Amino acid sequence: MKSRILATAVASVTMLAMAFVANAGQPEKEELVYHDATEFLIGGKATQKTLTPYDRLPASYEKTTRPELWRHGHHSAGIYVRFRTDSPIIKARWTSLYGAYMNHMAPSGIRGLDLYVLDEGKWYFTGVGRPSKNDKTSEYVLVKNMDRKEREYMIYLSLYDGVTSLEIGVDKASVIGKPQVDSPRRGCPIVMYGTSILQGGCVSRPGMAHTSLLERALDMEVINLGFSGNALLDLDIAQLMASVETPAVYVLDNAPICRADRINAHSVEFFRVLRDAHPDVPVVIVEHPLYPTMRLNNAEREDIIARNNAQKAFYETLRKAGEKRIYYVSAEKLLDEMKEGTVDGDHFTDLGVTYYVKAVMPTIKKALKASPNKVGK
């Protein structure tokens, strides 16, 4: 009996010693300290006068704007947080406003986050925050196992849900603070107005929205004023766009939700609000994409053609009135020739967004050259 107890004790000590040797030199589990993201730089907003840090519409609009539009204003599409840290691990803890779900879009795009790192002047994707399935509060490690080196980071917030709180977790021995590099360059943003597609439907994660792709490609802040089902040329949105102090370019991409009669009735008045506030700022007008379903759906084909005819007539009206610095993007190249690029025939996948950006980029660059408001390198 004694020999059995002794053998067991020896075996236990041996196993403990082996475990100690195996763990020798291994780093201890990181102890994280969380920081409220509002301590850092929040970008991608037309105004800071919002109910919460991650809203897109002014608090003053709560009682005056349409309820549907106000609700979508809580969605944090296009908003980002910029910071720097030398932490070897970055974790996010965030709470969604609605806990939204859609059957044609990935949860990581609806209410997730993603992380980018600035390396030699360019932004690179480095991690995604996947939302919790059954809880509005989510925690996710965005990146880990890095060298302890100070880097500049950007977190894009959820596209189709609001964010009520966001905390960034870093190693307790790390330094974290506001960014030291102005990228994306701020001060003269591109202000884009549009529908669910512009809001980000239905890309896989927030950084793939085409406003964000343009933002990184041009190294310029882009304000996403995409409102799913609600880009109806409301004048309060025109006034919000006009309130941006030094916009570089305005982009009007509302045709996918505005029928031809609404475009005919309200576009010039909407444009006039922008032009009265900023007479020399270029305006880019974008046609309705040619959806793949147009091939067989006769009613949809006729509707889209009518909308684009109305959009072109709006542009021609401005041109004949002597308006300068107005630009037009036709529909033909907004999707690829085979029309592969949508999840449901309407909303763009990541592939569709890349085609869109390729199509609009030359016109936006031309407009930027003509703009009186430029950001310096």
Residue ranges and their predicted role:
Residues P189-M192, V222-L225, A248-D253, P282-V286, ...:
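Structural recognition of the beta-strand scaffold that forms the well-ordered cores
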Residues H210, H266, F270, R307-F314:
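A general structural detector for well-ordered alpha-helical segments in enzyme core domains, enriched
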Residues T211-N224, E316:
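Short helix-loop-beta junction
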Residues G187-T211:
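Catalytic nucleophile-elbow at a beta strand-turn-alpha helix junction centered on a G-D-S/GDSL motif
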Residues M102-A106, G200-M208, R301-I305:
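Glycine- and acidic-residue-enriched helix-capping/strand-helix junction motifs
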Residues C202, P206, L214, L232-A277, ...:
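Oxyanion-hole/transition-state-stabilizing segment in secreted/luminal serine hydrolases
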Residues K2-A7, A17-P189, A367-K377:
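N-terminal secretory targeting modules
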Residues S243, Y291-K377:
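Catalytic His-Asp segment of secreted/periplasmic serine-dependent ester chemistry enzymes
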